[in-house]
């Protein structure tokens, strides 16, 4: 059975006819065409599919699309503006926190959720925020440094205002 799904996706209101059993991951990738959210384990284990739902990290591979009805959903595509990387994305690039890139969107979205909640996280808080995201390439040191760099850049920007 299909029903209408209404949500705000990356700042825009959407309304789509979606099967009741469709996963949020499939909705984003197949229906909407947003492929930044990666399909990794399909079991809620790797974090590659992390998106933000009302500013909180959520695994799109284990969330039905209809569970986000009426909510604000953000994917990694929402972070760059007019082709310019966000401070967080730029920090991941600068600090080589991307390597193969497969886990990067999920890492970035988990980090974005952390920085929105806590603009100046400790290393332990960063480690805890990234704990649900598996990375076989970087060993997490570069990812953690990326988050620290982005946090400092954001705080510096806020102080300049």
UniProtKB/Swiss-Prot annotation:
Superkingdom of origin: Bacteria
Top enzyme category: oxidoreductase
GO MF entry, a single one: metal ion binding
Cofactor note: Binds 2 [2Fe-2S] clusters per subunit.
Catalytic activity line of the entry: oxidized 2[4Fe-4S]-[ferredoxin] + benzoyl-CoA + H2O = 4-hydroxybenzoyl-CoA + reduced 2[4Fe-4S]-[ferredoxin] + 2 H(+)
Signal peptide (UniProt feature, chain positions): none
Residues annotated as binding [2Fe-2S] cluster 2: 100, 103, 135, 137
Keyword terms, alphabetized: 2Fe-2S, Iron, Iron-sulfur, Metal-binding, Oxidoreductase
InterPro entries documented for this protein: 2Fe-2S-bd (IPR002888), 2Fe-2S-bd_dom_sf (IPR036884), 2Fe-2S_ferredoxin-like_sf (IPR036010), 2Fe-2S_ferredoxin-type (IPR001041), 2Fe2S_fd_BS (IPR006058), 4hydrxbenzoyl-CoA_Rdtase_gsu (IPR017606), Beta-grasp_dom_sf (IPR012675), Diverse_Oxidoreductases (IPR051452)
CC cofactor: [2Fe-2S] cluster
Reported regulation of activity: Inactivated by low concentrations of cyanide in vitro.
CDD domains: fer2 (cd00207)
The enzyme's E.C. designation: 1.1.7.1
Residue positions binding [2Fe-2S] cluster 1: 41, 46, 49, 61
Sequence ranges assigned to domain 2Fe-2S ferredoxin-type in this UniProt record: 3-79
Positions of transmembrane segments: none
Protein purpose: Component of a complex that catalyzes the reductive dehydroxylation of 4-hydroxybenzoyl-CoA to benzoyl-CoA. Reaction is not reversible. Is a key enzyme in the anaerobic degradation of phenolic compounds.
PANTHER family from the UniProt entry: OXIDOREDUCTASE WITH IRON-SULFUR SUBUNIT (PTHR44379), XANTHINE DEHYDROGENASE IRON-SULFUR-BINDING SUBUNIT XDHC-RELATED (PTHR44379:SF8)
Assembly with partners or alone: Heterohexamer of two alpha, two beta and two gamma subunits.
NCBIfam families for the chain: 4hydroxCoAred
Name of the protein in its database record: 4-hydroxybenzoyl-CoA reductase subunit gamma
